[in-house]
C-alpha cells in the first residue's frame, strides 16, 4: 500500500513542492519506507527529490526549495512486491516519449507476462523489480505508438486504454507529462482509492489535486472533491488557469469493489473513501463485534475493554459501549516508532512491539481483559500484547479482531505476508488463541464486516484476503513469484543488488 498525490496550481509562479510535501505528511500512514516528489518547471524540465525514509526526513528545506514548478506528484512507499532499496523509490521517470513521471499505488498480478511483452515485443528494459516501473513503461509504450511531435488529451486517453487492456490488478496512479499535464487513473474494479478535488482562488482560478485519501483535501482547503470511478481517468493541463480538467470513462466499470482492508486498517479514520466514512465503518465494526462477543462470552467474563492503539480505538470504544463495559487505554504508544504492520521484515516487527507499546499495569492487574485490535495478521503483535497484559497481572485475556480471520495473500498492494506466515492459515480459532497465548480469539464475521462498510451504491468489496477469491483472478505462478520476492527481500539479497542499480532520473537523492 502506498500514498499518492498530485497538484496543479493555477499560478504558475508559485512552487507546488511545499504543498506536496505537506500533503505527504497527511498520507504518511500509508507508507513509511520511502518518499518522493517530482515537479515540472519551465520548458518542461523535471525536478525530483526522493529517498528512503519518512517524508520529514527526505524532504528537507534545502531539497524542497530546489523543486521548481507549479505542477507535481508525490509518492509514499510501503514496500510490496519490490525491494525496499533507494532505486525503488517513486516517482519513476522515463524520458521517452515526452518525459513521463508516474507514482503508483497497488499491485499488478500479471507481471510475468507483462515483462515478457516489454522485452520481446516492445523492447523496453525494466531495470528494477517494481511493478510500478513496469506500469510506467507500458503506458510509455502505448503513448509512443502515436509517434507524434506533441500529444493531446485524446492520445493520453487512448494510451490508457492500452494500459487497461494489458494490466490486471488493483492500481491507482498519478503522473506527469513534461510541460503538458498531470493525469490520474484508477483500476476498473476500484480496488485502490483515488480522489480528485478543486480549490477556488480569490481571482476565480482553480487549483487541482489528486490524492489517495480525502483527508488531504480538507487539510488544504480543497472543499470540492470526489472519487474517480473505476476505469476513469482525468487530465489536468499544466496551465490550468486557461484550461479545464478533462475526465473520461476510459473503460467500462468492471465492478465497484474497494479493498475492505482500507476501512479495517489502512485509511485514516477522518477520511471518506468512495463515499464511505472510515470512522463510521469502524464504529459499526465495534457494534457488530460486540454482538458476536456476547454469543461466545458471558457479560461477567469481561471486566474491561482495552484497544491496541491507534487504529482499533474507534472500534473498541463502540464495542465497550455495546457491551456495557468500561473502556480503558491500557497501552501507551511511543509515537516515534513506526506502524509495525508496515515494517518491511519480521525481525523489525518483533523488536518494535515492546518499544512501541508500554502497558499500564493498573488497567490490567487482577482483571479479565478484552483486547480489541483491527486485525490479526502474522500474530507477532498480538502475541506480544497478550504477554504484556498477563505480565501486568491480567487474570484472563480475550482477544477480539475487527476483521475476519486472514488466511490468504493480499495481492493488490498490502504486504500482509506469505500465506504460510499468516497465523490463521490452516489453524482453527482455538489454535490461534493457543499460539498467541490468550483464553479465546473472537473474529468479526465477513458478512458483518461487509454490512459495516456497504452503501446503497457499493455492496461488494475486494475480500480476497478472507476468502481467497480475487476479483481480477491471478496469473499462474504469480503468488509463488510474490512470495519468492518477499523471501528475497527478507534475506536482503534483493536490496543489496538494488542499492547499486542505475536509474536514469530514478536514483534516489541520498
From Swiss-Prot:
> Which HAMAP family did the record assign?
PurF (MF_01931)
Q: Where is the active site?
A: 2
This protein is called Amidophosphoribosyltransferase
Q: Which reaction does it catalyse?
A: 5-phospho-beta-D-ribosylamine + L-glutamate + diphosphate = 5-phospho-alpha-D-ribose 1-diphosphate + L-glutamine + H2O
List the CDD domains hit by this protein, alphabetically.
GPATase_N, PRTases_typeI
Q: Which InterPro entries match?
A: GATase_2_dom, Ntn_hydrolases_N, PRibTrfase_dom, PRTase-like, PurF, PurF_N
Q: Which cofactors, if any, are listed as required?
A: Mg(2+)
For this protein, the record's Pfam families field holds: GATase_6 (PF13522), Pribosyltran (PF00156)
Q: What else is known?
A: Present with 18700 molecules/cell in log phase SD medium.
* Single GO cellular component term: cytoplasm
Q: Which organism is it from?
A: Saccharomyces cerevisiae (strain ATCC 204508 / S288c)
A GO molecular function term, named singly, is: amidophosphoribosyltransferase activity
Its GO biological process terms?
Answer: 'de novo' IMP biosynthetic process; purine nucleobase biosynthetic process; purine nucleotide biosynthetic process
Residue span, Glutamine amidotransferase type-2 domain: 2-239
Amino acid at each position: 500500500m502506498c500514498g499518492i498525490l498530485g497538484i496543479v496550481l493555477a499560478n504558475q509562479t508559485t512552487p507546488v513542492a511545499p504543498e506536496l510535501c505537506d500533503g505527504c505528511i497527511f498520507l504518511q500512514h500509508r507508507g513509511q519506507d520511502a518518499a518522493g516528489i517530482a515537479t515540472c518547471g519551465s520548458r518542461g524540465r523535471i525536478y525530483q527529490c526522493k529517498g528512503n525514509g519518512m517524508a520529514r526526513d527526505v524532504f528537507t528545506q534545502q531539497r524542497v526549495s530546489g523543486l521548481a514548478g507549479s505542477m507535481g506528484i508525490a509518492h509514499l512507499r510501503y514496500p510490496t512486491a519490490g525491494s525496499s532499496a533507494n532505486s525503488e523509490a517513486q516517482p519513476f521517470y522515463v524520458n521517452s516519449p515526452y518525459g513521463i513521471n508516474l507514482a503508483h499505488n497497488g499491485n499488478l498480478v500479471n507481471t510475468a507476462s507483462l515483462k515478457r511483452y516489454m522485452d520481446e515485443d516492445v523492447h523496453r528494459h525494466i531495470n528494477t523489480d517494481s511493478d510500478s516501473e513496469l506500469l510506467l513503461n507500458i503506458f510509455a509504450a502505448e503513448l509512443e505508438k502515436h509517434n507524434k511531435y506533441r500529444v493531446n488529451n485524446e492520445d493520453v486517453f487512448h494510451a490508457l486504454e492500452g494500459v487497461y487492456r494489458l494490466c490486471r490488478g488493483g492500481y491507482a496512479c498519478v503522473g506527469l507529462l513534461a510541460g503538458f499535464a498531470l493525469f490520474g487513473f484508477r483500476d476498473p474494479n476500484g480496488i485502490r482509492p483515488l480522489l480528485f478535488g478543486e480549490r477556488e482562488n480569490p481571482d476565480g482560478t482553480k487549483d487541482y489535486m489528486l490524492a489517495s485519501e480525502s483527508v488531504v483535501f480538507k487539510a488544504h482547503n480543497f472543499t470540492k472533491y470526489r472519487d474517480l470511478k473505476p476505469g476513469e481517468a482525468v487530465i489536468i493541463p499544466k496551465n490550468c488557469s486557461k484550461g479545464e480538467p478533462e475526465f473520461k470513462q476510459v473503460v467500462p466499470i468492471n465492478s465497484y469493489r474497494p479493498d475492505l482492508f482500507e476501512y479495517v486498517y489502512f485509511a485514516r479514520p477522518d477520511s471518506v473513501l468512495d463515499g464511505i466514512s472510515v470512522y463510521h465503518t469502524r464504529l459499526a465494526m465495534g457494534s457488530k463485534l460486540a454482538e458476536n462477543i456476547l454469543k461466545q462470552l458471558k457479560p461477567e467474563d469481561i471486566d474491561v475493554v482495552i484497544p491496541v492503539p491507534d487504529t482499533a480505538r474507534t472500534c473498541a470504544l463502540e464495542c465497550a459501549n455495546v457491551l456495557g463495559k468500561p473502556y480503558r487505554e491500557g497501552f501507551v504508544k511511543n509515537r516515534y516508532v513506526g506502524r509495525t504492520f508496515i515494517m518491511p521484515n519480521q525481525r523489525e516487527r518483533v523488536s518494535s512491539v515492546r518499544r512501541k507499546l508500554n502497558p499500564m499495569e493498573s488497567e490490567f492487574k487482577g482483571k479479565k481483559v478484552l483486547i480489541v485490535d483491527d486485525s490479526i495478521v502474522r500474530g507477532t503483535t498480538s502475541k506480544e500484547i497478550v504477554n504484556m497484559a498477563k505480565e501486568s497481572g491480567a487474570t484472563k485475556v480475550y482477544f477480539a479482531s475487527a476483521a475476519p480471520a486472514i488466511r490468504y495473500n493480499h495481492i493488490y498492494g498490502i504486504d500482509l505476508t506469505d500465506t504460510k506466515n499468516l497465523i490463521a492459515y490452516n489453524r482453527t480459532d482455538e489454535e490461534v488463541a493457543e499460539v498467541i497465548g490468550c483464553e479465546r480469539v473472537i473474529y468479526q464475521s465477513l458478512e458483518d464486516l461487509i454490512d459495516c462498510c456497504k452503501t446503497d451504491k457499493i455492496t461488494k468489496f475486494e475480500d480476497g484476503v478472507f476468502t481467497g477469491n480475487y476479483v481480477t483472478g491471478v496469473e499462474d505462478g504469480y503468488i509463488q513469484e510474490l512470495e519468492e520476492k518477499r523471501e528475497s527481500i527478507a534475506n536482503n539479497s534483493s536490496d543489496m543488488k538494488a542499492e547499486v542499480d542505475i536509474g536514469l532520473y530514478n536514483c534516489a537523492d541520498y
